[in-house]
């Protein structure tokens, strides 16, 4: 470790121990070095004994700064790793920090743009509209058309801080499999790698711009979701320029009610937006917390969501989508056998998993959920229960599903905050069943043919040549097989002859030895020489 890394590591240890987080170290033999090492820092003790463990963990991460705050936010979605009291506290972490100087923001934008700010913008406001750990936002107008825009600018010098802390996280992750019996299955280095990728993606605002453009295209003219326009000509890796929006924060229930918003429809549309993104588009906004969601002031009886901050997105492949949809439907039909089979078929748990045992475990954990009214059952907690059960059957962490679960919990919490009577299953079931029907049968075949038509139209003129090449390759392959067969037969014949010669040679050698012991020297010499010669010829035939 470098001196800088050692200083940072000591700071992390000091903060963790001052909040009593050594309580998280399990009392098992493998962690004995950690527990012994804890006594080396005898002067550091828990100064927050009046607070719960989850709250102390949250406060410690806040004290360590933005990189650890974001890590805690991501880990709050890993409810397969943490008990609810800790995960709930981590979910309260707020990514809000003081804004940096507006003059510095202006300078940073001008460096990125390659000229004076006034070349492209009027009315730049040096006072930040919003500020977070990675970036902050300022308002302005486009000089060419006077449209109101926001400029998102990355914090100067944030990259070295992120890289230094992530390097330390990798080192710490390397210790986890050695100290925890379940550490290897949790794939801690992969968790850190996923977190690093998320952070670095957020640092590249061109990626966020591309995500926003894709989402806007997916929901063009949609009555459910509006994504602000991105002015890509003005975007740089550290600067994002997009349309300024005006709306009611989705968490401001009083303002929405005063506006006369149809809260039931708004809540249902949140669910529909999520499932449309996941199953129709395979591309979903994965940071849909209330700070990134607004509701348009226009037509409150037919409410429209406005989504911002598209830095984090997720996607599922076709197989994952199918298994996920079938899992939900099988679960709500209480077909636990099918749920178990789907987990095995998808590869989420090992192929040699005992399906009967797995089914029984799922039934034991999930059946009590149905003691609640159907409208009160949480999709997110259904996934959580399934993943926690599958974990006992060596299910490896699926990062894409973790991101989906986090987003689903956001959507559920938001929907029930807007309309407590929201029946998520009634809203989602028709969508899931319709999507599954579209994946099979003649319509699915026709759609697949349409999708592949351009490819085959391009390849069709080359078809005769491809057929000829295939026939030639088949002919050459056949000749190679015949040649190889002859070689193998010859080799087998030589090996048979060699075995015969080895047998004859061994017999002659043994006979010669017996004759030699009987003082028949001349005869024994002939036998021994003949035996050695037979062995030599046999050896040569094997070469």
Swiss-Prot record:
<feature type="transmembrane region" description="Helical">
    <location>
        <begin position="517"/>
        <end position="539"/>
    </location>
</feature>
<dbReference type="InterPro" id="IPR045308">
    <property type="entry name" value="UbiB_bact"/>
</dbReference>
<protein>
    <recommendedName>
        <fullName>Probable protein kinase UbiB</fullName>
        <ecNumber>2.7.-.-</ecNumber>
    </recommendedName>
</protein>
<keyword id="KW-0472">Membrane</keyword>
<dbReference type="InterPro" id="IPR004147">
    <property type="entry name" value="ABC1_dom"/>
</dbReference>
<dbReference type="GO" id="GO:0010795">
    <property type="term" value="P:regulation of ubiquinone biosynthetic process"/>
</dbReference>
<keyword id="KW-0831">Ubiquinone biosynthesis</keyword>
<dbReference type="GO" id="GO:0005886">
    <property type="term" value="C:plasma membrane"/>
</dbReference>
<dbReference type="InterPro" id="IPR010232">
    <property type="entry name" value="UbiB"/>
</dbReference>
<comment type="similarity">
    <text>Belongs to the ABC1 family. UbiB subfamily.</text>
</comment>
<feature type="domain" description="Protein kinase">
    <location>
        <begin position="123"/>
        <end position="501"/>
    </location>
</feature>
<feature type="active site" description="Proton acceptor">
    <location>
        <position position="287"/>
    </location>
</feature>
<keyword id="KW-0547">Nucleotide-binding</keyword>
<keyword id="KW-0808">Transferase</keyword>
<keyword id="KW-0812">Transmembrane</keyword>
<keyword id="KW-1003">Cell membrane</keyword>
<comment type="function">
    <text>Is probably a protein kinase regulator of UbiI activity which is involved in aerobic coenzyme Q (ubiquinone) biosynthesis.</text>
</comment>
<dbReference type="GO" id="GO:0005524">
    <property type="term" value="F:ATP binding"/>
</dbReference>
<dbReference type="Pfam" id="PF03109">
    <property type="entry name" value="ABC1"/>
</dbReference>
<feature type="binding site">
    <location>
        <begin position="129"/>
        <end position="137"/>
    </location>
    <ligand>
        <name>ATP</name>
    </ligand>
</feature>
<keyword id="KW-0067">ATP-binding</keyword>
<feature type="binding site">
    <location>
        <position position="152"/>
    </location>
    <ligand>
        <name>ATP</name>
    </ligand>
</feature>
<comment type="pathway">
    <text>Cofactor biosynthesis; ubiquinone biosynthesis [regulation].</text>
</comment>
<dbReference type="InterPro" id="IPR050154">
    <property type="entry name" value="UbiB_kinase"/>
</dbReference>
<keyword id="KW-0997">Cell inner membrane</keyword>
<keyword id="KW-1133">Transmembrane helix</keyword>
<dbReference type="InterPro" id="IPR011009">
    <property type="entry name" value="Kinase-like_dom_sf"/>
</dbReference>
<dbReference type="GO" id="GO:0004672">
    <property type="term" value="F:protein kinase activity"/>
</dbReference>
<dbReference type="GO" id="GO:0006744">
    <property type="term" value="P:ubiquinone biosynthetic process"/>
</dbReference>
<keyword id="KW-0418">Kinase</keyword>
